[in-house]
C-alpha cells in the first residue's frame, strides 16, 4: 500500500476534522484562477467537464486504502482543481458512499452550480461546501478571475436553486480579502444575498497560507470578527491543529502527495516526519532535498515557510 495517485491524507481540517482527500482532477485544472488560492495560479483554465481519470481506478484505489482499518472523519472530494469539472462526480459520490459510512463532502468554488447536471450529482453528497464570498460581478471577477462566460448572477442563482433542494449539510465558505470584499458595505451586500440561501453553517476565512498572488492581503481580525457577528458565522482564520498522515511509504513521495493538494509549513512538515519516526538527521536531509527540488516553491508568509508544488 505504498502508491496512491488519487487518495491523499488524511489531513487535519478546520471544518471537517480528519479529512481523507479524493482528487479526481489533474493539477491546477479549474474554471477559476482565484487570487487567494493556496495551491497557486491555475495552469489550465476550462469549463469543460471531463472524466479526467477513470472512475474505476479512483474507486479501486479507495478500496485498497480502506482495506485495513484507517482513522478518518470524512471523505472530501477536492484536491488539485475544481471537483465539479469531473464528469462522473455523481457516480463517484455514490460509489464512495457504498464503501464507507463516513460522510462524503464536496468542496466547490460554486462556478458550475448553474448546471442542472452538476446540481443533481451533488445532491448525493452528505456535505457540500460552496464558496460564497462575492456580491457583484466586479467582486466575482476580482476574487476568482473566472474563465469564459462564468458570471456572478449565474453562479449565485445556481447556488440558491441548489440550496433549496439539497437535503444534506450546506456549509457556506466566505473568504475575506482586504480591500476587495472586506468593507462594512461589502459585507452588508453579502448578507443580503446569503439570506436567499438555505445553509446549515457559514465559515468566515481569510488567507492563512500563501495566496496565489503575493499582493493579496488577508482580512484583519477586526474585519473577521465583524463578519462573524454580522453573518452569524464561524471563524476559521487560523491554521489547523493535528498531524498530517499518508499511507505512502516513501517519506519524500508522501510529502509530495500532500503538498501538491495542500501546502505545508515547516512545523507541519517536521511534525509529519516525526510522526513517521524519522531521526533529526533524516528530517534535515529531507528539508535539504525540498530546498533543492526545482518543482517546489518555498514561500515566507505570516512568519512561516510554506512548501507547495509549482
Predicted segments with their positions:
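Glycine-rich beta-strand-to-loop/alpha-helix junction loops that act as flexible
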Residues: 76-82, 109-110
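Conserved AdoMet/S-adenosylmethionine-binding subsite of the radical SAM
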Residues: 85-226
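Short strand->helix junction
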Residues: 27, 44, 82-83, 179-180, ...
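Short, basic/glycine-rich phosphate-binding loops at helix/coil junctions
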Residues: 38-42, 71-75, 135-139, 170-171
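Auxiliary Fe-S-binding modules of radical SAM enzymes
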Residues: 1-18, 60, 67, 182-310
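Canonical Radical SAM [4Fe-4S] cluster-binding loop centered on the CxxxCxxC motif
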Residues: 14-57
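Conserved, mostly hydrophobic/aromatic
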Residues: 22, 34, 130, 202, ...
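Conserved alpha-helical substructure of the radical SAM core
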Residues: 40-77, 87-91
Amino acid at each position: 500500500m505504498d502508491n496512491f495517485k488519487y487518495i491523499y491524507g488524511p489531513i487535519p481540517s478546520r471544518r471537517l476534522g480528519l479529512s481523507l482527500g479524493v482528487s479526481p482532477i489533474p493539477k491546477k485544472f479549474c474554471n477559476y484562477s482565484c487570487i487567494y488560492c493556496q495551491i497557486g495560479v491555475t495552469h489550465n483554465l476550462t469549463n469543460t467537464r471531463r472524466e479526467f481519470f477513470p472512475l474505476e481506478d479512483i474507486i479501486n484505489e479507495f478500496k485498497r486504502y480502506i482495506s485495513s482499518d484507517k482513522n478518518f472523519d470524512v471523505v472530501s472530494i477536492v484536491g488539485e482543481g475544481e471537483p465539479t469539472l469531473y464528469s462522473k462526480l455523481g457516480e463517484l459520490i455514490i460509489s464512495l458512499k457504498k464503501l464507507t459510512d463516513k460522510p462524503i463532502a464536496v468542496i466547490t468554488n460554486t462556478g458550475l452550480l448553474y448546471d442542472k447536471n452538476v446540481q443533481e450529482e451533488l445532491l448525493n453528497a452528505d456535505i457540500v461546501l460552496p464558496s460564497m464570498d462575492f456580491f457583484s460581478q466586479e467582486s466575482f471577477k476580482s476574487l476568482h478571475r473566472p474563465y469564459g462566460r462564468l458570471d456572478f448572477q449565474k453562479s449565485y442563482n445556481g447556488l440558491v436553486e441548489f440550496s433549496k433542494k439539497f437535503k444534506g449539510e450546506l456549509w457556506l465558505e466566505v473568504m475575506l480579502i482586504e480591500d476587495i470584499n472586506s468593507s462594512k458595505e461589502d459585507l452588508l451586500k453579502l448578507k443580503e444575498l446569503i439570506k436567499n440561501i438555505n445553509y446549515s453553517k457559514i465559515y468566515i476565512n481569510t488567507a492563512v497560507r500563501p495566496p496565489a498572488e503575493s499582493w493579496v492581503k488577508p482580512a484583519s481580525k477586526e474585519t473577521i470578527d465583524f463578519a462573524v457577528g454580522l453573518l452569524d458565522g464561524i471563524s476559521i482564520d487560523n491554521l489547523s491543529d493535528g498531524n498530517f498522515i499518508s499511507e505512502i511509504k516513501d517519506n519524500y513521495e508522501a510529502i509530495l502527495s500532500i503538498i501538491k493538494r495542500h501546502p505545508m509549513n515547516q512545523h507541519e512538515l517536521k511534525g509529519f516526519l516525526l510522526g513517521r519516526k524519522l531521526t533529526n538527521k533524516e528530517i534535515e536531509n529531507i528539508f535539504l532535498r525540498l530546498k533543492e527540488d526545482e518543482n517546489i516553491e518555498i514561500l515566507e508568509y505570516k512568519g512561516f515557510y510554506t512548501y507547495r508544488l509549482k
